[in-house]
A protein has these predicted regions:
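Glycan-recognition and catalytic cores of secretory/periplasmic carbohydrate-active enzymes
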Residues: 1-256
Length: 256
């Protein structure tokens, strides 16, 4: 039913208007801090691409281009080999406890959004190079060489991180890494990415599933032991795990 696609497109355009019109939305940051966030920039890539699969519109392609350009220009900071979560309004580095934050799982998720777009464009070389750079940087920051798994937060100067869960292992960074490494292997044929995929997949499936009752726990200590047994809450719903399984199945089917 095309009417649902049209409704989704209309809502997407309204969201863009709200984001672009000062005063319509409550400011995310205090007026004293002019900043922009990684979250909305990256999620608009995926949202636009999902709507585009149902209905074509130039606004969708434009938003994908704009978001990718912003990520490359403002959020990627080669001096730290990192994609930062919060930057100044023109991409300036904010040398505070919030401005130094790296969220490896979030960045890895961004990398596969861009890999997916590169694939859509017949493996566009520039997008592929950008996505792999983000993935490589973020894996280096995120993979816990001592205990395994993707860690929650890092500081780009290796200073203390504010969030108390900074060294925990949440479920969703692992699922995003499983997808991203498989996409990267499909794009390049580089065995490095297949090994990374097996690494994170093996670790996730060894630690997150409840072997007695099924489903995944959401929150592990750094060493992989369960921090709390709830399998669903305000943040953990039926999204990241099914998406990982569906995407993984589709990619493996293409590869095999």
């Amino acid at each position: 039913d095309r009417t649902y696609a049209e409704k989704a497109l209309d809502l997407f355009k309204r969201i863009l208007r709200n984001l672009a019109t000062p005063g319509l939305l409550e400011p995310k940051y205090l007026p004293t801090l002019q900043a922009r966030g990684h979250s909305i920039t990256m999620i608009l890539i995926n949202t636009a691409s999902r709507i585009r699969a149902a209905i074509a519109d130039p606004a969708l392609d434009k938003q994908i281009d704009d978001s990718i350009a912003l990520l490359q220009k403002d959020f990627m900071h080669p001096e730290f080999n990192a994609l930062l979560e919060t930057v100044g309004s023109n991409g300036e580095f904010i040398d505070t406890i919030n401005g130094r934050i790296i969220n490896p799982g979030h960045c890895i998720e961004t990398s596969w959004f861009i890999l997916e777009e590169a694939k859509y464009r017949n493996w566009d070389k520039d997008l592929l190079q950008l996505a792999l750079q983000i993935l490589d940087w973020s894996w280096e920051w995120g993979w816990d060489k001592e205990f395994g798994g993707i860690i929650n937060f890092r500081d780009c100067r290796n200073l203390p991180v504010q969030d108390y869960s900074q060294d925990m292992k949440f479920w969703w960074p692992q699922t995003e890494a499983i997808i991203a490494t498989l996409y990267a292997y499909q794009a390049t044929g580089d065995e490095k990415y297949l090994q990374m995929h097996q690494q994170v997949s093996d670790w996730a499936y060894a630690h997150f599933p409840d072997k007695e009752y099924g489903e995944w726990y959401g929150y592990l200590h750094r060493d992989g032991t369960v921090a709390q047994p709830a399998k669903g809450n305000l943040f953990k719903g039926p999204f990241h795990i099914p998406r990982m399984m569906i995407r993984g199945y589709m990619l493996c089917k293409e590869l095999l």
